[in-house]
Amino acid sequence: MILVTGGTGLLGSHLLLELVREHNEVVAVKRPSSDLEAVRHIFSYYTGEVEELFRLIDWVDIDLMNYAEVERAMIDIDQVYHCAGLVSFQPRDARRMTEFNVQSAENLVNACLETGVDRLLHVSSTSTIGRAPEGVPANESMIWARSKTSTSYSESKFKSEMEVWRGIEEGLKAVIVNPAVILGPGFWDRGSSSFFRLVARGMKYGAPGVTGYVGVQDVVGAMTRLMDSDISGERFILSASDQSVTEIMEMVAETMGNPRKMKAVTPRILRNLIRLDAIRSVFTGRRTLAPELARSAFSQTHYSSEKISKAIGFEFTPIGEVIRQVAVHYLADHSD
């Protein structure tokens, strides 16, 4: 039996679909307030048997911060996919995010060890990969260290990884994946999926910052293949290609039938937008442009996926094809 955390998110919902399609017994962790209709909608992109497959999932309400609840959920579980995690670049969320990301990982690792779970797959992020020398793509051997440009999110994910490495030292069979920015259909109002909404609404600005991108189905494919292997005590970068924000936005615009060159946002423009956003937040109570996130708009990081390719012969879908597939679903969802 397989337990999945974070099953109501972009990655988790795609993973659940793959697992039930392969006739696995699946337990999915959720909060009482979780929106399961969003998961059903993800399923509908790929199958006409939404309800039949959805009924195969045993949904359970569990507080991942409560160790006793987590341990009880592990009874009869063979494999655990830990996809849950908070993502925020707002300073006000840093403490809560770090507490949840680290404590949930600690509780899951301890419960896996206590109940004898066979394998754990932990979803981390490329943000925990250390900085590479100029001109060299970052790889799994490069260790994260706090710096002026690091974010609270990257620190929380690094500390979460440390819990998994601690579990491995104590005898747990576990593997870690470090996906780049994940592109996939659904959840159009948040995360990387909002690229499509922004372009559809006429966004004209891009940014020179470069990072890795990967399709959600590739991430799921790599995860399940790693879980089915004997590999343990390793982490793997999952990145199809490195692109600038401008390049991604222009690919999205072209695929959605409205090709255009994006104007380059400058540091001065961005600083002014951040100041305006700070003033606006006095009235709204929420900042949209966090300084941490804004800094990444001009940073350039390249990643190597050579390790996963050599380990299991994994091949990534070209990011242009991923964008084309996602755009089809965006346009279908907004055809009215």
Name the predicted role of every residue range.
Residues 159, 190-191, 207-227, 234:
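Substrate-positioning beta->alpha
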Residues 84-87, 124-125:
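Conserved NAD(P)H cofactor-binding loop of Rossmann-fold oxidoreductase domains
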Residues 168-216:
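NAD(P)-dependent short-chain dehydrogenase/reductase
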Residues 149-175:
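Active-site Tyr-X1-5-Lys
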Residues 94-95, 99-152:
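Conserved Rossmann-fold NAD(P)-dependent oxidoreductase catalytic core, especially the SDR/UDP-sugar
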Residues 1-79:
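N-terminal Rossmann/SDR dinucleotide-binding element
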Residues 223-289, 305, 310, 319-320, ...:
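Mid/C-terminal beta-alpha module of Rossmann-like enzyme folds, strongest
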